[in-house]
Every structure is written in structure tokens, then in C-alpha cells.
């Protein structure tokens, strides 16, 4: 049931390096269970390789920032027709940021696209869309393409009152 899903924090080992006071980058190993739809001749098996997310963030003097990210993941499943463990590689890229264009007003945004990354997109996480059955090859799964994004404005009227409007 989609409404009973919960977002869980994933085990992760991450290294972040500050190149300057404005530029930082991070590289991680993250264990994310893929969520996929099994076909008639495919079966879930334990995952063996962690996801590899990377991020680069540039911060501006006024509190604004721009961040680019990417993830590479290998997802395992069992092809029961050929009795083989198979790997499908997924990938994703994102661009996000906050633009502080007035003292108390900011614009935030994010866009993401990839294949096999449904667990990284909140609205479709856990819905079986990392891998889906390949309609032209029994016993095979393929990475499902997904995209998402949002844009929003925030205004601080005072220290205790803020208004936000978002579109996703």
C-alpha cells in the first residue's frame, strides 16, 4: 500500500571534502534495497554491491547554493529461465539549489532523472519501479526510467512566521 510506505535512512559511509569555503564534494557507499517488480520468471536475491552517490556543492556569499549529484547502482535479480544471477545497472543525476534573491525570500528547486532510481524519488520510492519485467525477454528485468522535480518559494515574515509555496 503506497500510503503505508515510510522513508528510511539508508546505511552509508560518506567522505566529504571542502575544497574551499564555497566548494565541497562528497563520495559515498550506500546500501539501498532496490524495489522491483518481479516477473513470472524472475526472483529477488540479496544485493551485493552498494550504491555510489557523488555530490558537488557550490555555496554563494548570500546563502544561495547550487548542487549537482549523481548515483550509480547495480541491482541483482535471479533469471529463473537460465538459472543465473543477473545485474542491471541503474544511474541518476540531479541538480538542485537555493537562490536567496531577497533578504527574506528564496527560491528552491530540484530536478532529477535516471534509470533504476525510484528509491531516490520520494513519490515513487518502494513501488517496485527500480526494475520492471522486460516485455520482450522472459526472465529479464530492465531499469525503469523516472524523473521528478520541484520548485518553491519561501518568505520569512519574521523570526517566527514563514510562508512557503511549492510545485512538484
Where are these regions (language model features)?
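Glycine-/small-residue-rich "gating" segment that lines the acyl/pantetheine channel
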Residues: 14
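Internal metal/ion-chelating core segments
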Residues: 20-81
Amino acid at each position: 500500500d503506497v500510503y503505508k510506505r515510510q522513508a528510511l535512512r539508508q546505511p552509508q559511509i560518506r567522505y566529504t571534502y571542502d575544497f574551499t569555503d564555497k566548494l565541497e564534494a562528497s563520495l559515498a557507499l550506500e546500501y539501498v534495497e532496490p524495489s522491483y517488480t518481479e516477473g513470472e520468471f524472475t526472483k529477488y536475491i540479496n544485493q551485493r554491491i552498494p550504491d555510489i552517490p557523488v555530490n558537488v556543492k557550490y555555496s554563494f556569499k548570500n546563502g544561495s547554493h547550487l548542487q549537482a549529484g549523481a548515483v550509480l547502482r547495480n541491482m541483482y535479480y535471479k533469471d529463473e529461465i537460465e538459472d543465473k544471477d543477473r545485474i542491471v545497472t541503474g544511474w541518476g543525476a540531479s541538480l538542485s539549489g537555493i537562490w536567496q534573491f531577497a533578504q527574506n525570500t528564496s527560491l528552491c528547486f530540484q530536478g532529477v532523472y535516471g534509470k533504476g532510481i525510484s528509491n531516490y524519488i520520494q513519490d515513487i520510492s518502494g513501488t517496485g519501479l527500480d526494475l520492471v519485467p522486460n516485455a520482450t525477454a522472459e526472465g529479464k528485468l530492465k531499469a525503469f526510467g523516472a524523473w521528478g522535480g520541484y520548485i518553491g518559494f519561501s518568505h520569512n515574515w519574521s523570526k517566527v512566521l514563514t510562508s512557503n509555496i511549492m510545485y512538484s
